[in-house]
Amino acid sequence: MREIVHVQVGQCGNQVGAKFWEVVSEEHGIDSAGTYKGDTDLQLERINVYYNEVAGSKYVPRAVLVDLEPGVLDSIRASSIGSMFRPDNFTHAQSGAGNNWAKGHYTEGAELVESVVDVVRKEAENCDCLQGFQICHSLGGGTGSGLGTLLISKIREEFPDRMMCTFSVMPSPKVSDTVVEPYNATLSIHQLVENADEVMCIDNEALYDICFRTLKLTTPTYGDLNHLVSGVMSGITACLRFPGQLNSDLRKLAVNLIPFPRLHFFLIGYAPLTARSAMGFRALTVPELTQQIFDSRNMMAASDPRHGRYLTASATFRGKMSTKEVDEQMHAVQTKNSSFFVEWIPNNIKSSVCDIPPKGMKMSATFIGNNTCIQELFKRIGLQFSAMFRRKAFLHWYTGEGMDEMEFTEAESNMNDLVSEYQQYQEASVDDEAMEDDAEAEGGAGQNEAVEEF
């Protein structure tokens, strides 16, 4: 079976991950002690994607929980789902990374990383046919970003041919937790470009917007935000875990979504998002789901898909529905909004259908898009990065842990290259020879304007 080993790193990663395990356990009918209490054999048929069956038919999540301080892991241990996890899979140090990427990547994290890789190796050895890893972390702090990227590169060395999918919480434009977020994020993106296969970009501000605008929550908590993310996480792998008419897995996703190896940063969305109060007044239909997943207000990262073009996209529908209708709707989206899709990749939407809907719903849809507008997110981080780096603000915290300024410069230029690659493909067209010169000229003009504005 196609198992996935789940690794959650740092405070954010562990909180999102804990919520994810609640959602998946509910879908498979597993209670907090790890025993099966479900009502249909379909829940057990491919349960071993995320769970390992141990003696006494107890199901244990294939999860590795990592942090540089004990706090969050202790609270997961004490929570209602704490007893599900294998106690050996909790790995933590005492000192914390203090929002410092260098501590997570080079000093504190480097001491812990070997023991984490051992745990990951044990989990991988329990698998018949390991498909890949999913990593949950944030890029703004120290542990998730520093230790998270270190772990990704270590796992990559050991399992070079397995998929590496990350759920990365990006720093938001308006909501900032720490001053040094731009540094941590830029250094992390530098690593993710090289070592990850698929990066799902999430950011808190977009999640807050969904909670305020769509779900009508007046005071959204992190629990609410994490619940949104976990819905997408479970949706992406639904096809692996339940029988479906059109299946997809992490590798099929990558093959269909990534036209060029560096461009693997995705926007994700989920439907139906409705306020609890309005739940009873909504009929769910395939056209409505399709319309909602392509809506910019549904994206979980603060980039507007209307500012860019889709290179590729993928949608996973769950529930009893006709595949013909799904295909028609997807085709309709493409023909109606053809200017938002690049014309040099015909039929660039992949759709898959899974027969089992999420708990308590008739149908749902998960969306993953590779849109050039994601460059907005990198540009924003890049501007904040260069503003601080020009003055060498806060650098001593990083150089003190043995980093070199050169690494910052490299990370910055790698991210700038990424932005210009996205821009290049946004402007590219089918008959490109003539166009390319124009695009370069335009691109040059655009950059100058931006500099003046700034």
Curated annotation (Swiss-Prot):
Residues 426-454 are annotated as: Disordered. Transmembrane segments: none annotated. It is found in: Cytoplasm, Cytoskeleton, Spindle; Nucleus. Keywords: Cytoplasm, Cytoskeleton, GTP-binding, Magnesium, Metal-binding, Microtubule, Nucleotide-binding, Nucleus. InterPro entries: Beta-tubulin_BS, Beta_tubulin, Tub_FtsZ_C, Tubulin, Tubulin/FtsZ-like_C, Tubulin/FtsZ_2-layer-sand-dom, Tubulin/FtsZ_GTPase_sf, Tubulin_C. Its cofactor is Mg(2+). SUPFAM superfamilies: Tubulin C-terminal domain-like, Tubulin nucleotide-binding domain-like. Mg(2+) binds at residue 69. GO terms for biological process: microtubule-based process. Dimer of alpha and beta chains. A typical microtubule is a hollow water-filled tube with an outer diameter of 25 nm and an inner diameter of 15 nM. Alpha-beta heterodimers associate head-to-tail to form protofilaments running lengthwise along the microtubule wall with the beta-tubulin subunit facing the microtubule plus end conferring a structural polarity. Microtubules usually have 13 protofilaments but different protofilament numbers can be found in some organisms and specialized cells. Tubulin is the major constituent of microtubules, a cylinder consisting of laterally associated linear protofilaments composed of alpha- and beta-tubulin heterodimers. Microtubules grow by the addition of GTP-tubulin dimers to the microtubule end, where a stabilizing cap forms. Below the cap, tubulin dimers are in GDP-bound state, owing to GTPase activity of alpha-tubulin. This is the major beta tubulin of mitotic spindle. PANTHER family: TUBULIN (PTHR11588). Belongs to the tubulin family. This is Tubulin beta-2 chain.
